[in-house]
């Protein structure tokens, strides 16, 4: 019996698919499709790891989220006691400058739009987390791609010009029975952003890229949140539900600074507050509700911006299941 298909078949999209070889606590190897641990949200993207009904807005505006690429990773744990560190070193497919734009900086540069990824200029990632104090984790990450223009869909689209990208991030979390606190900062630098902008505005209308420019030289995001476990106030009485009232502040701007001759859009500068509740019905099941207010065009923590503010109320339900057993 002979069968043939005239139209293209479907495909399966995976966030992670890799093979891991555990060699020693201090050195292990992973190869395949994996998370790129740049920033707090990508490294800890499950919804029980942030209080809001949606992922932190700043990081997910300027960085891919969830950021996953194909490559190889070396990881392990060094030291012991108060001098315990986890590390990750990755070489992955680099970001594609075709996806860089005004409103999301490099967030849309993640590869995967087509069936093949370009590995002409790989991305190099280093992440280190300090875990020596119980309940405390302090981390930092660095991403470097020597030429994001080299990963363009068309090899000569950027006429041989280079566009190096550097992303720096730092984050921390402190968690005990009473309180959970998190903070993070991301700063990015794109060289030759003015030239990238001049080319991206001329991308084909048939492409799915936004073509909205200019792409900024620098982007930034920083945030902090604190939640209090109400059950702890009642001596951890099991009859009291596990509810965390929380507050979160974020500032982000995908157009923090441009090159000479570039005009940045003030509307991309956002200062925002989020307040709400998280009810953990189960350790891995959380019901969320929050209220958000965004001030547009200002970096001030308090006060209003020159544009109309945005206010919204959200409710969410999240369940995390990594493994299942009878």
Residue ranges of model-derived segments:
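Outer membrane beta-barrel
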Residues: 1-97, 120-125, 129-137, 218, ...
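Outer-membrane beta-barrel pore domains
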Residues: 17-21, 42-44, 139-326
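Loop-centered beta-sheet repeat module
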Residues: 105-151
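Short leucine-rich amphipathic alpha-helices used at interfaces
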Residues: 5, 48-49, 107-108, 114, ...
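Active-site rim elements
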Residues: 59-61, 112-115, 212
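Short glycine/proline- and charge-enriched loop/turn segments
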Residues: 48-56, 106-109, 200-205
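A short secondary-structure junction signal
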Residues: 84-87, 98-104, 141, 151-153
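Active-site glycine- and acidic-residue-rich loops that bind
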Residues: 65, 115-122, 160-164
């Amino acid at each position: 019996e002979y069968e043939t298909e005239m139209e293209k078949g479907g495909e399966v999209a995976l966030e992670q698919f890799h093979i891991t070889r555990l060699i020693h606590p201090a050195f292990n190897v992973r190869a395949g499709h994996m998370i790129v641990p740049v920033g707090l949200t990508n490294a800890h993207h499950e919804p029980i790891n942030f209080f809001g009904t949606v992922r932190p807005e700043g990081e997910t505006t300027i960085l891919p989220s969830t950021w996953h690429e194909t490559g190889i990773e070396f990881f392990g744990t060094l030291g012991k006691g108060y001098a315990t560190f986890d590390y990750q070193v990755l070489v992955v497919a680099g970001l594609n400058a075709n996806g860089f734009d005004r409103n999301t900086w490099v967030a849309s540069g993640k590869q995967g739009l087509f069936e093949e990824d370009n590995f002409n200029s790989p991305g190099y990632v280093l992440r280190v987390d300090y875990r020596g104090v119980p309940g405390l984790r302090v981390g930092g990450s660095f991403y470097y791609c020597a030429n994001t223009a080299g990963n363009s869909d068309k090899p000569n689209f950027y006429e041989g010009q280079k566009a190096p990208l550097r992303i720096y991030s730092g984050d921390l979390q402190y968690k005990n029975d009473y309180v959970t606190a998190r903070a993070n900062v991301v700063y990015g630098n794109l060289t030759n952003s003015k030239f990238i902008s001049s080319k991206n505005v001329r991308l084909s209308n048939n492409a799915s890229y936004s073509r909205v420019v200019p792409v900024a030289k620098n982007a930034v995001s920083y945030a902090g949140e604190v939640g209090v476990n109400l059950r702890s106030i009642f001596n951890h009485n099991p009859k009291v539900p596990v509810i965390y009232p929380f507050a979160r502040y974020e500032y982000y701007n995908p157009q923090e600074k441009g090159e000479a001759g570039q005009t940045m859009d003030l509307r991309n500068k956002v200062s925002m507050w989020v307040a709400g509740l998280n009810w953990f019905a189960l350790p891995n099941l959380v019901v969320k509700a929050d209220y958000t207010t965004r001030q547009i065009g200002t970096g001030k923590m308090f006060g209003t911006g020159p544009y109309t503010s945005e206010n919204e109320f959200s409710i969410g339900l999240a369940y995390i299941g990594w493994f299942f057993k009878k």
